[in-house]
Amino acid sequence: MKTLLPNVNTSEGCFEIGVTISNPVFTEDAINKRKQERELLNKICIVSMLARLRLMPKGCAQ
């Protein structure tokens, strides 16, 4: 029987691992990866929303 683990090479997999093991390093890495994945930045998921918030200049709400 195979165990399906999240792919640490993707932002979603990295975020899932970070949340599962409560490791902020994985979570931050996932957010930074998502900032670079422009085609996925508008996807409706937590990691995309956090990445968009980090990209907005401070003091500028959109």
Curated annotation (Swiss-Prot):
Specify whether RNA-binding is a keyword of the entry.
no
Q: Output the InterPro entries linked to this UniProt entry.
A: DicB (IPR008022)
A Pfam family annotated for this UniProt entry: DicB
Membrane-crossing residue ranges in chain numbering: none
Q: What keyword terms does UniProt attach to this protein? A: Cell cycle, Cell division
Any GO BP annotation:
regulation of cell division
In which domain of life is the source organism classified?
Bacteria
Summarizing the function annotation, the protein's role is: Involved in cell division inhibition; this function can be repressed by DicA and DicC proteins as well as antitoxin CbeA (yeeU).
Protein name per the record = Division inhibition protein DicB
